[in-house]
């Protein structure tokens, strides 16, 4: 994780903090107390827990060590809302977070406001020395808040999908136009540079006197094309040898994936990894998550409610196992994360608008290639450290590195990913069976 020094930082950092926190609360305004408390599965967390945990992060890593006289809102929250930081202390079991009926939503909101009040106090009196000590923690805390905005949405959608009323809490989804036949971008291979540049590199120059988290006053905000923050797992920058390959020029659509289903793709073990086939059989998987078959027609649930499946929209909520099976059926494969980054680094992320009132892929908000801002794209690469990787010192070193086992990398960001996280070097990661994230398929092949 790196951050460039900023001048006169108190005002911009305070504004960035307030905007990030306000945006989280904007997402939950339509929700009831029950909506915020329930938990649909062990991998998901209640909305209320996300609201509290992000406050716990600022309280634990920023306020307690740096604001003299700070008093915790409730000492018991250190146990309730610690996620996985073993060096901080024990945690309440993740799979039982839905049992935390108290504190209620109003008390969690009071906790957030308590933390906000004291963060405002701290950020209003930043000295050069304090800024120097917080130049990693402040951007990390904001990035962490934004990551939980996306997780909050995916967890809420999974919860609502179980409800037979299929609640709608956002504007209707818009139909995609028919797509052209799949095309391919060829790449010759060779030695390529992968990873985020180190601070001070020519590609890392930044002269703005404000933080990299850029906000405006509207419900939507636009991507800042020069973010200064990088997670530690995006570094060090290093060379990788690529062999000639081609990358598909768009994502796989619902209609194309439905053809895989109609062809018996879920029943043909030759398409599947051994572990994927065992998962498919054990869980009785026969279509993507949130697809329903009614009256000989496919339907899909989203936070806009239940609607007829759009055959031209990109297929989403797909596991790595399903993505690999589909690619095998097509005679293709998934890209490695290095192939994806090499291709995507040549494309500027679109000046996309993130809108919390529309939480599904939208045809007008993406470039035709759908590299960024549409769906997270599975790669065949296992999540591993780059050569020379070193986690951050102290408890925040548990943020990324300790999860580099039994997970696969996704790239590109989704329609619900905050724009500060949209960049070629960003590495998301999940276990291969994960489906409740906004994940899709981009194929590759040897050239």
Per-region residue spans from a language model:
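Disulfide-stabilized, aromatic/cysteine-rich ligand-recognition loop
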Residues: 1-45, 49-57, 61-122, 131, ...
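Secondary-structure boundary/capping signal
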Residues: 35-36, 127, 334, 351
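Short acidic, Pro/Gly- and aromatic-enriched capping/linker segments at domain boundaries
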Residues: 42, 179-180
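Helix-capping and short linker residues that terminate individual alpha-solenoid repeat units
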Residues: 120-127, 348
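Functional-site microenvironments in short loops/helix caps that host divalent-cation chemistry
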Residues: 141, 151, 155, 159-174, ...
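Generic detection of short hydrophobic beta-strand segments and adjacent strand-loop junctions
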Residues: 185-187, 213, 240
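Long, compositionally biased low-complexity repeat segments characteristic
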Residues: 202-216
């Amino acid at each position: 994780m790196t951050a460039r020094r900023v001048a006169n930082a108190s005002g911009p950092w305070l504004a960035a903090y307030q905007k990030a926190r306000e945006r989280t609360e904007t997402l939950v305004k339509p929700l009831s107390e029950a909506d915020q408390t329930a938990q649909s599965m062990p991998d998901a967390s209640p909305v209320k827990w996300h609201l509290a945990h992000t406050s716990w992060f600022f309280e634990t890593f920023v306020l307690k060590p740096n604001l003299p006289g700070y008093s915790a809102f409730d000492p018991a929250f250190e146990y309730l809302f610690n996620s996985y930081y073993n060096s901080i202390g024990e945690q309440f079991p993740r799979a039982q977070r839905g049992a935390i009926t108290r504190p209620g939503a109003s008390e969690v909101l009071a906790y957030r406001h308590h933390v906000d009040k004291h963060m405002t106090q701290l950020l209003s009196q930043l000295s050069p020395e304090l800024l120097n000590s917080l130049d990693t923690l402040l951007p990390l805390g904001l990035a962490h808040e934004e990551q939980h905005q996306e997780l909050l949405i995916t967890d809420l959608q999974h919860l609502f999908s179980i409800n037979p009323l299929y609640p709608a809490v956002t504007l209707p989804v818009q139909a995609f136009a028919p797509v052209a036949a799949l095309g391919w971008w060829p790449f010759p291979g060779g030695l390529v540079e992968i990873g985020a540049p180190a601070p001070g590199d020519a590609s890392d120059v930044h002269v703005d006197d404000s933080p990299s988290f850029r906000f405006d006053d509207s419900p939507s905000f636009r991507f800042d094309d020069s973010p200064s923050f990088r997670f530690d797992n995006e570094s060090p920058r290093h060379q990788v040898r690529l062999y000639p390959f081609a990358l598909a020029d768009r994502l796989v659509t619902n209609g194309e994936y439905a053809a895989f289903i109609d062809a018996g793709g879920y029943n043909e073990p030759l398409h599947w990894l051994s572990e994927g086939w065992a998962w498919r059989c054990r869980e009785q998987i026969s279509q993507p998550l949130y697809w329903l078959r009614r009256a000989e027609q496919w339907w899909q649930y989203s936070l806009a409610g239940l609607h007829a499946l759009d055959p031209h929209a990109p297929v989403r909520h797909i596991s790595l196992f399903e993505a690999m099976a589909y690619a095998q059926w097509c005679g293709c494969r998934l890209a490695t994360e290095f192939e994806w980054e090499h291709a995507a680094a040549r494309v500027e992320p679109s000046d996309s608008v993130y809108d919390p009132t529309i939480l599904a892929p939208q045809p007008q908000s993406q470039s035709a290639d759908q590299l960024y801002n549409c769906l997270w794209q599975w790669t065949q690469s296992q999540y591993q450290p780059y050569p020379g990787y070193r986690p951050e010192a102290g408890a925040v070193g548990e943020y990324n590195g300790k999860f580099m086992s039994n997970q696969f990398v996704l790239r590109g960001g989704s329609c619900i990913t905050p724009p500060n996280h949209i960049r070629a070097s960003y590495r998301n990661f999940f276990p291969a069976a994960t489906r409740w994230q906004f994940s899709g398929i981009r194929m590759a092949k040897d050239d």
